Amino acid sequence: MIIRPAQLLDIEKLSPLYAELGYPVKEAELVRRLKTVLSHPDYHLLVAVDDNEIIGMIGYAKMLFFENEGAYYRILILAVLQNYRRKGVATALLDAVKNCALSENIHALALNSGDTLERQIAHRFYENYGFKQASRGYSLYLK
């Protein structure tokens, strides 16, 4: 397995990962969306590839702190195909982001995760990785 930056040709292969997260999306819409997101220099997407198949992805953005100096990486999406879970793929993706952060002198990672029964396994994974529950998230959709 290798972890590498996503390429434009990869985008159309990511829809199964979105579907497994509960966000089914048409390939054309996903291509359009990710081209926009990834055109921003602070947004990044890494993919895990095994035997020429994309089996996982992690998307993150460099954010600036308001409350103190410096920056952090906010993980915006992390997904692994069902057949590859519990095989170290998500850990490898997080390790890659952590290494990128440390190379840029960034010393914090943050993420939000849905408060649903389906996400309980992910929450345990994050805690086992070293994340601490630090806040509560809220959403207000305006459309």
Spans of model-derived segments:
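Conserved N-terminal entry element of GNAT/NAT acetyltransferase domains
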Residues: M1-L9, K143
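Short hydrophobic/aromatic beta-strand or adjacent loop that forms the aromatic wall/cage
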Residues: Y43, Q133-Y138
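Acetyl-CoA-dependent GNAT
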Residues: L8-G70, L76
